[in-house]
Amino acid sequence: MKLSAFDFNLPSELIAQSPSSERDNSDLLIAAMPPIKTKFYNIIDYLKEGDLLVLNNSKVIKAKLHLWKNVTINLNQKLSDDSWSAFAKPTRKLHVNDEFYFDNHKVIITEKLVMGEIKVKFDLDNISVFEFLDKYGEMPLPVYIRRSHSLYHTTSTLCHTRENGYSEKLDAFFRRNDIKDKDNDIVYDNERYQTIYSQIEGSVAAPTAGLHFTNDILDKLKTKGIHTAFLTLHVGAGTFLPVKTENIHEHKMHTEYCSITPETAEIINKAKQERRRIIAVGTTTLRTVESFCNNGIIKAGSFETDIFITPGFKFQTADMLLTNFHFPKSTLFMLICAFAGFKEMHELYKYAIKEKMRFFSYGDATLLYRK
């Protein structure tokens, strides 16, 4: 199929720049005939006793680092305990063996690849990489979320040297500009760009379908007899990479680490055997269960998946998919077209745009049924 077949006109004002006032107050579009627009807190009305929700428990790390002046990197994938791949901007200002200091810690450029990708090594003083990122990093918000007053556009002026530590310069910057709580946007995003059930650190972008859930909703689902199970897929920066080939089957899909425990595999297989509905919460969950499914059976394990789901794909696991609204010509829009129908998804998105529903990471959700 051609890439142009997955295009549609999306007004820029529908790109959500911030989350809804409350997690479950976002809109939810049920892909019925005709579509039903409601609030996410009503999702329980569209699920029934015995249903199984499968959710991604990966936790977003603070993967964005300001290295020097206007140079930033966004971590992509863990290569070893102290090494990661990353995307740099701009790469022309970086060289192999460049060293950047954050107080007593050091980040070293070890390799420059293509398309802005680099490899970095962390030389840290008695803390883990995740502990380092939690102190010095920022939430890796997608580039289409723009905050004119945010620290994301100002800390890039702060350089890191051994003589002038990061913490001191940053604190001075906050005092000088009278910024409270080290920028309210950052404090807010640290909470809202993370699911409430996230546990396993490793994602550099949020599994956004899960952002709408609250503890109250999870409690009500349990009371109604709706089951939950958790798996892990660490979302990589490649999730935002555009498809550049007109023939979509020539696109090279990025790889992402995923894992399913024996307990979760057993829960999913039992639901399938008992013919209960399985609802994948997010495209990351759907890609994971389909990656692990062989002849209708989920087997526990972990590996790197590069599964690319396009129309014609034979789904073996999920009956329904809860997901946010996706970019035109993206691999995720191709996925939902494969799951719920090419024509049907174009029509549903036309309806969503007419209803001014909010798109992408901080946007609204839709509940799809497998065609």
From Swiss-Prot:
Is-annotated flag, keyword Disulfide bond?
Answer: no
GO MF term set: S-adenosylmethionine:tRNA ribosyltransferase-isomerase activity
Domain of life of the organism encoding this protein? Bacteria
Q: What's the EC number here?
A: 2.4.99.17
Name the chemical reaction catalysed here. 7-aminomethyl-7-carbaguanosine(34) in tRNA + S-adenosyl-L-methionine = epoxyqueuosine(34) in tRNA + adenine + L-methionine + 2 H(+)
Listed under GO biological process in this entry are:
queuosine biosynthetic process; tRNA wobble guanine modification
| Localization per record | Cytoplasm
Keyword Protease: yes or no?
no
Q: Which UniProt keywords apply?
A: Cytoplasm, Queuosine biosynthesis, S-adenosyl-L-methionine, Transferase
Tell me the first and last residues of the signal peptide.
Answer: none
Against Gene3D superfamilies, the record matches this protein to: QueA-like
Q: How does it assemble?
A: Monomer.
Protein name, entry field? S-adenosylmethionine:tRNA ribosyltransferase-isomerase
